[in-house]
């Protein structure tokens, strides 16, 4: 999928889509549509497949969300609903969308709910309680996605869980790039987190939906390809090996005259324990997808593959095949195939036990 010629809503890019099967079994994408001035809406499109079962195009179906709430608007007339991930939350029997709401305060995680994917109810900004002296609220936060079922919180109680990446001051890739050799890593402030929210025992949405009170640090940068930053990608999906997440990592490329610290966004795989998702069973030592195509190397932001959507291909009798939908250089949407192996590869990187990479 790429910007439609003459469509003012897509002038600056079509990227970073959510992907989810609807009640009708069709696959729907929720791409970020960027208009002039970095004004972002969340669209909706139905995926078309060719005879081989591969995605071959989309049918645009309109807008799912556009900036309307105060937490999505900026004073200059701009605003943003960005980078959605959609999960069917089984305890709520509804679809939940986590997206970045971009206001004058910066990006924050917002939630919306739907039963049919076409009509969405805003739930407001997610809130996060403090953890060991760390204040999450008031901090830029992005790359969020939800587990489809309740999972045990740090106390062992089943709760709704969200994967997210707070962007504490000083932890952006642009701020870290250029530091030579080894550097100190603040494990709490440079990590992907899982945070937990109580849900009503009857499975209905409660008044505290979106209030995440407990937390667990999941992963921090380990390998060279993710040295500058790691962040969430596709929503967790359960496989026979555990919870599969395709996440992103950022490294620094060789300097050029145009950019003293050019960055490279790649994608890797993380598998979490089925019973205890706080435990990483496998993690990519090397990326599984890197910017190599011209559309990934040149665009609004060069050298970016940014995974956000995942689709298990049960529909064609291939449950070990996963189609990954990702942003290409912040301008287009690509698709890649990931085949689940019978056994996890040996030697997957563990999480960092020391504050140095």
Show which residues each predicted segment covers.
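Extended, compositionally biased non-globular segments
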Residues: 307-311
């Amino acid at each position: 999928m790429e910007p439609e010629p003459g469509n003012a809503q897509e002038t600056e890019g079509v990227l970073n889509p959510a992907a989810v099967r609807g009640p009708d079994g069709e696959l729907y994408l929720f791409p970020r549509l960027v208009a002039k001035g970095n004004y972002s809406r969340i669209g909706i499109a139905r995926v078309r497949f060719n005879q081989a079962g591969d995605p071959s195009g989309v049918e645009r179906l309109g807008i799912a969300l556009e900036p309307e709430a105060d937490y999505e608007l900026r004073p200059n007339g701009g605003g943003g609903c960005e980078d959605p991930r959609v999960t069917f939350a089984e305890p709520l029997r509804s679809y939940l969308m986590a997206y970045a709401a971009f206001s004058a305060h910066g990006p924050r995680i917002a939630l919306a709910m739907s039963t049919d994917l076409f009509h969405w109810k805003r739930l407001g900004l997610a809130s996060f309680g403090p953890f060991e002296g760390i204040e999450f609220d008031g901090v830029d936060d992005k790359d969020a996605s939800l587990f489809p079922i309740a999972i045990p919180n740090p106390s062992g109680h089943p709760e709704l869980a969200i994967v997210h990446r707070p962007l504490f001051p000083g932890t952006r890739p642009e701020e870290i790039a250029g530091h030579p050799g080894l550097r100190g890593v603040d494990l709490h402030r440079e990590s992907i987190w899982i945070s937990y929210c109580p849900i009503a025992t009857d499975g209905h949405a409660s008044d505290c939906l979106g209030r995440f009170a407990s937390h667990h640090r999941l992963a921090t940068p380990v390998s060279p390809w993710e040295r500058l930053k790691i962040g969430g990608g596709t929503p967790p999906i359960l496989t026979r090996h555990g919870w599969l997440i395709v996440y992103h990592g950022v490294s620094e490329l060789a300097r050029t005259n145009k950019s003293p610290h050019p960055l490279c966004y790649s994608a890797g795989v993380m598998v979490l324990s089925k019973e205890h998702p706080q435990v990483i069973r496998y993690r990519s030592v090397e990326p599984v997808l890197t910017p190599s195509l011209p559309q990934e190397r040149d665009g609004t932001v060069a050298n970016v593959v940014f995974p956000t959507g995942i689709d298990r291909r049960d529909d064609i009798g291939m449950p070990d095949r996963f189609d990954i939908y990702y942003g290409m250089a912040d301008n287009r949407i690509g698709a890649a195939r990931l085949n689940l192996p019978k056994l996890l590869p040996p030697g997957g990187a563990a999480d960092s036990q020391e504050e140095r990479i």
